[in-house]
């Protein structure tokens, strides 16, 4: 059984017991979160596709950890002018473990 959920403007294919890295959620570690923006649920041959979301579809998950991703360096420069700009960015994320998929 698997499902496709939307979180943080991205779509993720998940199944029970899987740990997924999502955009940062303001929920404490160890808490339970429910996702109701479920776009598809597949259980063998029984497939439910929403338009855009499945009515009554719900995914429950437990927040495992919060953190920041690897650093990405942004560099801007103009040739022959000795103009150089450096900027770094680290995106926040939340790891969640899928505990249940329901329709």
Curated annotation (Swiss-Prot):
GO terms for biological process: translation. GO terms for molecular function: rRNA binding; structural constituent of ribosome. This protein binds to 23S rRNA in the presence of protein L20. Part of the 50S ribosomal subunit. Contacts protein L20. The gene is rplU. Keywords: Ribonucleoprotein, Ribosomal protein, RNA-binding, rRNA-binding. HAMAP family: Ribosomal_bL21 (MF_01363). This is Large ribosomal subunit protein bL21. It comes from Sodalis glossinidius (strain morsitans).
């Amino acid at each position: 059984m698997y499902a496709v959920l939307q979180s943080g403007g991205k779509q993720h294919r998940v199944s029970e017991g899987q740990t997924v890295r999502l955009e940062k959620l303001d929920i404490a570690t160890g808490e339970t979160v429910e996702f109701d923006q479920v776009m598809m649920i597949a259980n063998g041959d029984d497939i439910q596709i929403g338009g855009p979301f499945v009515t009554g579809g719900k995914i429950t998950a437990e927040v495992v950890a919060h953190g920041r991703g690897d650093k990405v360096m942004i560099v801007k420069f103009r040739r022959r002018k000795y103009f150089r700009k450096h900027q770094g960015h680290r995106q926040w994320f939340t790891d969640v473990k899928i505990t249940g998929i329901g329709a």
